[in-house]
């Protein structure tokens, strides 16, 4: 048996193992109304994308409120938006890796540290990594919180004179978590 045929009993279809049919969900609800003295708009949303490659997900929660009102010489209002985003991205360039992996390399190999197949660089010059192993052994998570908006107050004692006060906010919090488990 030729040494380059070590894994010849395997016929791994890396594309089928890595790519999948993904579910995308997008839900939104809103409520609005008003009258002579003011109006309002409130909305909330949820978006989820499981991703077409193994180990890739994204979801977002969003909320918005816009109101305005008037009382005598005063007008006031605000526009506020909040979003929370969670992303679990691929750990590697999955598409390059599954194209570079040879079908004679198994996904799992209990003889290797971590139990994943990766081939032998002396025999298989793949220039890729086992994308299933990378996704299973590495954890990466991005979390983003964002609040932005504006508030305003207008004082109009006469038709020809008005004072308008504006304030705004843009807060952004970002968290990146990464963990690498033992194995190849």
Briefly describe each language-model feature range.
Residues 24, 35-36, 70-74, 156-158:
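Outer-membrane beta-barrel channels and translocator barrels
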Residues 161:
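An active-site-proximal structural segment forming one wall of the substrate-binding cleft
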Residues 1-30, 40-52:
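Short strand-turn segments of transmembrane beta-barrel domains in outer membranes
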Residues 26-28, 62-64, 148-150, 154:
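Membrane-embedded beta-strand positions in outer-membrane beta-barrel channels/transporters
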Residues 31-33, 143, 153-155:
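Short secondary-structure boundary/capping segments within folded domains
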Residues 1-11, 51-148, 164-184:
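Surface-exposed loop/interface segments of Gram-negative outer-membrane beta-barrel transport/assembly proteins
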């Amino acid at each position: 048996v030729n040494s380059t045929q070590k894994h010849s009993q395997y016929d791994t279809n890396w594309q089928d193992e890595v790519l999948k049919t993904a579910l995308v969900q997008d839900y939104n609800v809103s409520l609005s109304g008003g009258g002579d003295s003011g109006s309002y708009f409130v909305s909330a949303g949820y978006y989820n994308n499981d991703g077409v490659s193994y180990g890739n997900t994204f979801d977002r929660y969003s909320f918005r409120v816009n109101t305005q009102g008037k009382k005598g010489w005063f007008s006031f209002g605000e526009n506020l938006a909040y979003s929370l985003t969670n992303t679990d991205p691929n750990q590697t360039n999955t598409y390059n890796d599954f194209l570079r992996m040879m079908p004679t390399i198994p996904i799992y190999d209990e003889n290797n540290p971590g139990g994943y197949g990766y081939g032998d660089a002396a025999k298989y010059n793949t220039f890729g990594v086992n994308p299933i192993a990378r996704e299973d052994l590495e954890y990466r998570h991005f979390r983003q919180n964002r609040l932005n908006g504006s508030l305003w107050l207008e004082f109009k004692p006469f038709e020809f004179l008005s004072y308008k006060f504006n304030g705004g906010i843009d807060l952004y919090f970002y968290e990146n978590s990464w963990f690498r488990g033992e194995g190849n």
